[in-house]
Protein backbone atom coordinates (compact mmCIF):
# COMPACT_ATOMS: atom_id res chain seq x y z
CA UNK A 1 0.00 0.00 0.00
CA UNK A 2 1.16 3.55 -0.76
CA UNK A 3 1.16 5.74 2.35
CA UNK A 4 1.65 9.50 2.62
CA UNK A 5 3.28 10.85 5.77
CA UNK A 6 3.72 14.45 6.93
CA UNK A 7 6.88 15.22 8.92
CA UNK A 8 7.49 18.24 11.11
CA UNK A 9 9.91 19.52 13.74
CA UNK A 10 10.32 22.83 15.54
CA UNK A 11 12.57 21.92 18.47
CA UNK A 12 16.21 20.87 18.62
CA UNK A 13 18.32 20.15 15.55
CA UNK A 14 15.32 20.05 13.23
CA UNK A 15 17.18 18.99 10.07
CA UNK A 16 18.99 16.16 11.86
CA UNK A 17 15.79 15.00 13.57
CA UNK A 18 13.90 14.90 10.26
CA UNK A 19 16.82 13.23 8.50
CA UNK A 20 16.81 10.51 11.16
CA UNK A 21 13.02 10.10 10.84
CA UNK A 22 13.33 9.84 7.05
CA UNK A 23 15.93 7.10 7.56
CA UNK A 24 13.46 5.17 9.72
CA UNK A 25 10.75 5.66 7.08
CA UNK A 26 13.11 4.28 4.43
CA UNK A 27 13.36 1.13 6.60
CA UNK A 28 9.56 0.78 6.48
CA UNK A 29 9.56 1.31 2.69
CA UNK A 30 9.48 -1.99 0.81
CA UNK A 31 9.73 -1.36 -2.95
CA UNK A 32 8.90 1.11 -5.68
CA UNK A 33 9.46 4.84 -5.50
CA UNK A 34 10.25 6.49 -2.17
CA UNK A 35 8.97 10.03 -2.72
CA UNK A 36 10.39 12.83 -0.57
CA UNK A 37 9.50 16.51 -0.81
CA UNK A 38 11.89 19.29 -0.03
CA UNK A 39 11.77 20.60 3.54
CA UNK A 40 9.85 23.83 4.07
CA UNK A 41 10.64 26.18 6.95
CA UNK A 42 7.29 27.56 8.04
CA UNK A 43 5.67 29.71 10.68
CA UNK A 44 3.91 27.65 13.38
CA UNK A 45 0.14 27.36 12.92
CA UNK A 46 -2.19 27.43 15.95
CA UNK A 47 0.80 27.07 18.32
CA UNK A 48 1.51 29.07 21.48
CA UNK A 49 2.98 32.56 20.88
CA UNK A 50 6.74 32.54 20.43
CA UNK A 51 6.87 28.96 19.15
CA UNK A 52 9.92 28.28 16.93
CA UNK A 53 9.68 27.86 13.16
CA UNK A 54 8.85 24.41 11.81
CA UNK A 55 10.57 22.34 9.18
CA UNK A 56 7.91 20.38 7.30
CA UNK A 57 7.95 17.81 4.52
CA UNK A 58 6.00 14.91 3.07
CA UNK A 59 7.08 11.35 2.24
CA UNK A 60 5.22 8.71 0.24
CA UNK A 61 6.33 5.11 0.57
CA UNK A 62 5.22 1.54 -0.09
CA UNK A 63 4.56 -0.70 2.91
CA UNK A 64 2.69 -3.82 3.95
CA UNK A 65 2.10 -2.39 7.44
CA UNK A 66 -1.51 -1.55 8.26
CA UNK A 67 -2.49 2.06 8.98
CA UNK A 68 -2.68 1.33 12.72
CA UNK A 69 0.72 -0.38 12.65
CA UNK A 70 2.11 2.72 10.93
CA UNK A 71 0.49 4.97 13.54
CA UNK A 72 2.08 2.98 16.38
CA UNK A 73 5.46 3.03 14.61
CA UNK A 74 5.20 6.81 14.25
CA UNK A 75 4.31 7.24 17.93
CA UNK A 76 7.36 5.17 18.88
CA UNK A 77 9.60 7.34 16.67
CA UNK A 78 8.11 10.55 18.12
CA UNK A 79 8.74 9.39 21.69
CA UNK A 80 12.29 8.30 20.81
CA UNK A 81 12.88 11.82 19.42
CA UNK A 82 11.82 13.36 22.74
CA UNK A 83 8.07 13.88 22.49
CA UNK A 84 6.35 13.35 25.87
CA UNK A 85 3.59 10.73 25.91
CA UNK A 86 1.01 13.28 27.12
CA UNK A 87 1.99 15.96 24.59
CA UNK A 88 -0.80 18.46 23.95
CA UNK A 89 -2.07 19.46 20.54
CA UNK A 90 -0.24 22.24 18.69
CA UNK A 91 2.66 22.43 21.12
CA UNK A 92 6.29 22.69 19.96
CA UNK A 93 7.75 19.27 19.23
CA UNK A 94 10.96 17.54 18.25
CA UNK A 95 9.16 15.27 15.80
CA UNK A 96 5.62 15.06 14.50
CA UNK A 97 4.61 12.32 12.06
CA UNK A 98 1.08 12.27 10.67
CA UNK A 99 -0.35 9.58 8.43
CA UNK A 100 -2.06 11.50 5.63
CA UNK A 101 -3.40 8.72 3.41
CA UNK A 102 -3.09 5.05 2.53
CA UNK A 103 -3.96 4.37 -1.11
CA UNK A 104 -7.67 5.10 -1.56
CA UNK A 105 -8.55 3.87 1.92
CA UNK A 106 -11.00 5.63 4.20
CA UNK A 107 -10.85 5.05 7.93
CA UNK A 108 -12.72 6.70 10.79
CA UNK A 109 -11.41 5.50 14.14
CA UNK A 110 -10.98 7.51 17.36
CA UNK A 111 -7.19 7.37 16.97
CA UNK A 112 -6.93 7.67 13.18
CA UNK A 113 -8.89 9.18 10.29
CA UNK A 114 -7.92 8.58 6.67
CA UNK A 115 -7.47 10.57 4.64
CA UNK A 116 -6.26 13.01 7.30
CA UNK A 117 -9.22 15.39 7.73
CA UNK A 118 -7.17 18.62 7.83
CA UNK A 119 -4.88 18.21 4.80
CA UNK A 120 -6.77 20.67 2.61
CA UNK A 121 -6.60 23.40 5.28
CA UNK A 122 -2.87 23.15 5.92
CA UNK A 123 -0.59 24.84 3.46
CA UNK A 124 2.45 23.42 5.29
CA UNK A 125 1.18 19.95 4.29
CA UNK A 126 -0.28 20.75 0.86
CA UNK A 127 2.82 22.55 -0.47
CA UNK A 128 5.27 19.67 0.07
CA UNK A 129 2.59 17.11 -0.83
CA UNK A 130 1.98 18.86 -4.15
CA UNK A 131 5.71 18.57 -4.93
CA UNK A 132 5.54 14.78 -4.91
CA UNK A 133 1.89 14.06 -5.85
CA UNK A 134 0.36 17.17 -7.49
CA UNK A 135 -2.44 15.27 -9.24
CA UNK A 136 -3.43 13.09 -6.29
CA UNK A 137 -7.15 13.02 -5.46
CA UNK A 138 -8.02 11.38 -2.19
CA UNK A 139 -11.41 9.91 -1.19
CA UNK A 140 -13.84 12.73 -0.48
CA UNK A 141 -11.80 15.29 -2.40
CA UNK A 142 -13.38 17.20 -5.26
CA UNK A 143 -10.02 18.53 -6.47
CA UNK A 144 -6.40 17.47 -6.86
CA UNK A 145 -3.69 18.32 -4.38
CA UNK A 146 -2.37 21.01 -6.75
CA UNK A 147 -5.84 22.58 -7.04
CA UNK A 148 -6.35 22.66 -3.27
CA UNK A 149 -2.89 24.19 -2.91
CA UNK A 150 -3.80 26.95 -5.36
CA UNK A 151 -7.03 27.70 -3.49
CA UNK A 152 -5.55 27.73 0.00
CA UNK A 153 -2.44 29.65 -1.06
CA UNK A 154 -4.69 32.55 -2.03
CA UNK A 155 -6.64 32.45 1.27
CA UNK A 156 -3.95 32.07 3.92
CA UNK A 157 -1.27 34.53 4.90
CA UNK A 158 1.36 31.84 4.83
CA UNK A 159 4.91 32.11 3.66
CA UNK A 160 7.86 29.82 3.59
CA UNK A 161 10.26 31.45 6.05
CA UNK A 162 13.73 32.41 4.82
Give the location of each predicted region:
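Generic detector of short, locally flexible boundary/turn motifs and exposed helical patches
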Residues: 1-3, 21-27, 35, 62-68, ...
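Short, structured patches in soluble enzyme cores that scaffold and shape functional sites
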Residues: 7-9, 63, 130
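N-terminal beta1-alpha1 ligand-phosphate binding loop
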Residues: 1-31, 36-43
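Flexible, gly/pro- and Lys/Arg-enriched active-site loops
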Residues: 39, 45-54, 65-162
Amino acid sequence: MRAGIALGSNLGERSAILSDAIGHLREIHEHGDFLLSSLHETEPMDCPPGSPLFLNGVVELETSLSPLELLHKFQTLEIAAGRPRNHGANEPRYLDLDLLYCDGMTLNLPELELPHPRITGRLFVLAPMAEIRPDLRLPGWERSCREYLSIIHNKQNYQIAH
